[in-house]
Amino acid sequence: MSGDIIDELTWRGLIAQSTDLDALRAALAAGPLTLYAGFDPTAASLHAGHLVPLLALKRFQRAGHRPIVLAGGATGLIGDPRDVGERTMNSSDTVAEWARRIRSQLERFVDLDDSPTGAVIVNNMDWTGPLSAVDFLRDIGKHFSVNVMLARDTVKRRLEGDGMSYTEFSYMLLQANDYVQLRRSFGCRLQVGGSDQWGNIIAGVELNRRLDGESVHALTVPLVTSADGKKFGKSTGGGSLWLDPEMTSPYAWYQYFVNTADADVVRYLRWFTFLDREELAELERATAERPHAREAQRRLAAEMTTLVHGEQHTRAVQLASQALFGRGDLRELDEATLGAALREAAGEGEVARVTPGEPATIVDLLVATGLAESRGAARRTVNEGGAAVNNQKIADPDWTPADGDYLHGRWLVVRRGKRNMAGVLRDGN
């Protein structure tokens, strides 16, 4: 039934820490195991870093086990302690709305059906909300040693700095209680999470033992960083790489992964996709022998975009990538994809704008987009054959766009040479 999911996770490099693996293998072999991972609504969307534990649940489900996905409506109000200081306290209404939005994202990654492996989605506010302070302190707090809690690395670092509120200090107890409640209600016996959650997860293992004399398991997946130690999942503009397409466009998502470094791409393929060993070995060979072709990066970007946004968006962004660099018809692109691509190309800057009724020549456009430093440089670019609009070369420095030149009535794609491209947006449309 399970194949050997532990071997699968091991060769993919997806086990950071665990309780006794032999005991876990035995539990998995005995029949369908129920496991869970939790995701706190600390923003309106999950981000790319959440995918590793979320996909781990999916891998277990494919191997014949039942995942529980927990949206932390209660723990999201408290906040897991960080090294960098207290989290902002968001309102109950805000966290509830974020939990609702995140739940809809979580539902896309696991199979919700009536089979023995059908996933369950829960919110820990359902059992934490009714819990009184007295019951919390007597029934849960009694089983925790303050000395052990103070020994956590994050707690020690915070106490050496500006300190920590009791609110965040108590987060571990709430997460531990989640594990107890899920075991009691669903027979859950494995918690999966990021390696930064190890202390909280082990607290849940211990609380199950202390309260009910029950033995349960824990497994963490690695936190994702690049080979040079940079934090994974930051977009071009420096913000998080969100799963919500309104917060990170499918085009920006695709471009992030297609620009993955050679040193990271095979590891990311192991962690983020379901490609088998043979496919991964071939892509690893391609990266070593033909790095310029970026076959592994393009496959990673396609797999990740399809996973999060669907095949239709993958095809659209691939078409946009080709068309924007002169290898396709820009007029075939839908406006949302075209606009997202041109805004992404602007990075942290603003997309250049033109006002209807105020003629702008190709020289004006090159300067406005920053593709030329001066009007003289722009003229030289045109005279040397290096200027193009919508993939059509422009040879006249006095050329101005007609209404029909604007894609979807709004956009121009201006290029200097083969690799330097920017968008121009016409106001008032």
From Swiss-Prot:
Motif: 'HIGH' region; annotated at 41-50
Q: Which reaction is recorded as catalysed by this protein?
A: tRNA(Tyr) + L-tyrosine + ATP = L-tyrosyl-tRNA(Tyr) + AMP + diphosphate + H(+)
User: Binding positions for L-tyrosine?
Assistant: 36, 171, 175
Q: What Gene Ontology biological process does one annotation of this record name?
A: tyrosyl-tRNA aminoacylation
A Pfam family reported for this protein in Swiss-Prot or TrEMBL:
SYY_C-terminal
What region holds the S4 RNA-binding domain?
A: 360-417
Give the EC class as a word.
ligase
Broad class of the protein's primary localization: cytoplasm
One GO cellular component term noted in the UniProt record for this chain: cytosol
Annotated ATP binding lies at: 234
Short motif ('KMSKS' region): ranges: 231-235
Known EC number: 6.1.1.1
- Role summary: Catalyzes the attachment of tyrosine to tRNA(Tyr) in a two-step reaction: tyrosine is first activated by ATP to form Tyr-AMP and then transferred to the acceptor end of tRNA(Tyr).
Per the record, the similarity remark reads:
Belongs to the class-I aminoacyl-tRNA synthetase family. TyrS type 1 subfamily.
NCBIfam families attached here? tyrS
Name of the protein this chain belongs to: Tyrosine--tRNA ligase
Organism encoding this protein: Nocardia farcinica (strain IFM 10152)
Q: What is the lineage of its organism?
A: Bacteria, Bacillati, Actinomycetota, Actinomycetes, Mycobacteriales
